[in-house]
């Protein structure tokens, strides 16, 4: 079996879907020596994605999310021979004589189109219906995403397999001495509230700021809030809200961290807060749990499925409830101990090896028969 895997996005985005692609490639290279792989890579990126003789890297000129992608990508692929193409970023090429597996991470753009840029709305909204129609099979990050595909796009349930993701194994408990250099570098004191992720409207950071202001007013000793991640899109309102709420001295923005520094931040935090309006998976929840950090997160999308009984769940529209949950998770020591213990048990359900094995099983089922 010869499998092509579209890894072009890794050059443009190292977080989120880019991390999914990298971990999947690394585990497949370790687990599957019986099949051949073609990694479709951006010609701009010289970084090897897999150190394995059965993995061939083919540089492509066509960039991700380009308006001419459906014209130029099939032309570039026509010179290659493979049985199956895995498109891990929602949209496959329409043309080509090969089986198509797509991964759908979430359907945020259908639930909350106002949370995307006009360009992103055009790319995903205009193509997702055709993508799920031409795909021979679909991998979904969670049961919540599978249910959305069935309900919103009319996909037959048997056409979708749920393959859960996992945190990077580097996320683990660290002692204070190991965290100290990272905290010193960013001038942080341990015990802060932490948000991690892209700064974008879907993450409900403005709601978090409003709830945090209310908590600080009620309890002036509330620790600082650290926003760790990168600026995504439509993020100006976040900075306007910080200024309007007079939180400049309490909120810190820490950008573009390597994963190793995120490990230290999770360990040094008193609490992770992820009040997203929608998540297709929610890796920060598992990353925090793997480090022993209590979690408060939204009850929307996949988060109840991923967090299990190991987090305090909140309605992201109820900012008073969010403030109360943060206060409780900071002050209730028996609850904090329970969340830590349950978090370690919960995160043990997930591994990239399991993700890769289940994905490989889909590859083999798809190529074994022309009938799904």
Where in the sequence are the language-model features?
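Carbohydrate transferase catalytic cores enriched for Leloir-type hexosyltransferases
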Residues: 1-372
């Amino acid at each position: 079996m010869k499998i092509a895997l579209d890894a072009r996005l890794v050059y443009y985005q190292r977080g989120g879907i880019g991390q999914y692609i990298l971990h999947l490639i690394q585990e497949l290279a370790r687990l599957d020596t019986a099949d051949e792989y073609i990694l479709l890579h951006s010609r701009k990126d010289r970084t090897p994605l897999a150190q394995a003789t059965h993995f061939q890297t083919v540089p492509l000129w066509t960039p991700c999310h380009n308006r001419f992608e459906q014209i130029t990508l099939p032309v570039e692929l026509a010179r290659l021979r493979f049985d199956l193409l895995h498109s891990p970023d929602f949209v496959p090429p329409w043309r080509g004589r090969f089986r198509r597996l797509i991964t759908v991470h979430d359907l945020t753009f259908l639930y909350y189109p106002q949370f995307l840029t006009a360009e992103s709305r055009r790319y995903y909204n205009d193509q997702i219906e055709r993508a799920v129609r031409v795909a021979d099979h679909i991998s979904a990050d969670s049961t919540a995403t599978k249910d959305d595909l069935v309900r919103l796009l009319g996909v037959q349930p048997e056409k979708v397999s749920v393959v859960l993701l996992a945190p990077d194994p580097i996320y683990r408990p660290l002692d204070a001495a190991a965290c100290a250099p990272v905290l010193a570098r960013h001038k942080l004191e341990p015990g802060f509230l932490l948000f991690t992720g892209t700064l974008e409207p879907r993450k409900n950071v403005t709601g978090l700021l409003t709830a945090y202001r209310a908590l600080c007013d009620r309890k002036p000793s509330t620790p600082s809030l650290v926003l760790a991640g990168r600026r995504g899109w439509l993020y100006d309102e976040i900075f306007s809200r910080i200024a309007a709420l007079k939180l400049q001295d309490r909120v810190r923005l820490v950008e573009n961290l390597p994963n190793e520094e995120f490990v230290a931040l999770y360990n040094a935090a008193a609490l992770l807060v992820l009040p997203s309006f929608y998540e297709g998976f929610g890796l920060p929840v598992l990353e925090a749990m793997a480090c022993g950090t209590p979690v408060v997160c939204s009850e929307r999308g996949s988060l109840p499925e991923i967090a299990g009984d190991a987090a305090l769940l909140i309605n992201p529209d109820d900012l008073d409830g969010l403030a109360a949950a943060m206060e409780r998770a900071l002050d209730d020591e028996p609850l904090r101990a329970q969340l830590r213990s349950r978090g370690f048990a919960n995160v043990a359900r997930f591994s990239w090896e399991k993700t890769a094995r289940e994905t490989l099983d889909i590859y083999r089922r798809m190529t074994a028969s022309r009938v799904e």
